[in-house]
Amino acid sequence: MKETIAYLGMGMWGFSLANLLANNGHRVVGWARNPALIEQLSVQRRHPAAPHISIPQNLSFTSHMEEALDGATMIVEGVTSAGMRPVLTQLKALTELRVPLVITSKGIEQNTGLLLSEIALEIFGRPAAQHLGYLSGPSIASEVLRGCPCSVVISAYNPDTLKQIHRAFLTPTFRVYPNSDLKGVALGGALKNVIAIACGISDGFRFGDNAKSGLVTRGLHEIRKFATIMGCRPDTLNGLAGLGDLCTTCFSAFSRNTLFGKLLAEGLTPEQAKTKIGMVVEGVYTALSAHQIATHHRIDMPITTSVYRVLYENLDIQEGIAQLLQRDTKEEYL
């Protein structure tokens, strides 16, 4: 069965998945607030961030959300974590959620500490859980656009919703694996961005592959510990939503979070680094939320804490590195 899909958010990530869904035979209407972007997409049939990619005819665009929702059998969002609440609030004013809503963004809301899926449930109410889905995993947008092989996970509370979303996204090169631990999938995608900033700092100081692999491994330990205390399955974090996404983000040349960390090591301030990148660096905001939650629950997360202190307490990076290296070497899995 082919879907009629409203895709909310036409940044590079949103466009890459909208393009994938259209190439998979679905009718897709992409929505964005920016009328100039919508006009360019509609007239030139090229995305400014990917001008080499031709847009299929069954992918259209609008800056009016009600037009995107007309006849939709599925809604997919691809906005920033900060944009999640206002976009879903606008969506709630236009429709009650009676079709699958697939979250593809990764982050934790500032101030509230809510996962993006929890924001959706707060806005639409607990009964909406039956329609909620979450897609995550190692998936660099530019590679998805090129049709490179990619493996991700999709999670949902309702088995029928899970099957419908799985069927919509699955292609010969975009492998979609079901996972029933939605909260674990969401946390893995959010927390890995903080570890990626630490890996970028390591890159900036040219500490080498040994140091970076150590950060990834100990970072995964932090993520898994945090998620387990939050009620998630540890195995979820050992898979694509945890280890897989963490590896891609920390080692990819296209990772904003890793680049951000590298720029910090080169002497830029956080604000200067964000300006130079010119796009949202989710790990900056997740570091604050994760630190607040970890402090409340007394979860020891030394790498995450160090990144937080560098960003929000003006901790000298060299001092932060020294503090990490001076920690006791406990039994590895404790």
Curated annotation (Swiss-Prot):
The keyword tRNA-binding does not apply. It is found in: Cytoplasm. Pathway: Membrane lipid metabolism; glycerophospholipid metabolism. Coiled coil: none annotated. It holds the Pfam family NAD_Gly3P_dh_N. The keyword Chaperone does not apply. PROSITE patterns: NAD_G3PDH. NADPH binds at residues 13, 33, 106, 141, 256, 280, 282. Its EC number is 1.1.1.94. Sn-glycerol 3-phosphate binds at residues 106, 137, 139, 192, 245, 255-257. GO terms for cellular component: cytosol. One of its GO terms (molecular function) is glycerol-3-phosphate dehydrogenase [NAD(P)+] activity. GO terms for biological process: carbohydrate metabolic process; glycerol-3-phosphate biosynthetic process; glycerol-3-phosphate catabolic process; glycerophospholipid metabolic process; phospholipid biosynthetic process. Belongs to the NAD-dependent glycerol-3-phosphate dehydrogenase family. Catalyzes the reduction of the glycolytic intermediate dihydroxyacetone phosphate (DHAP) to sn-glycerol 3-phosphate (G3P), the key precursor for phospholipid synthesis. This is Glycerol-3-phosphate dehydrogenase [NAD(P)+].
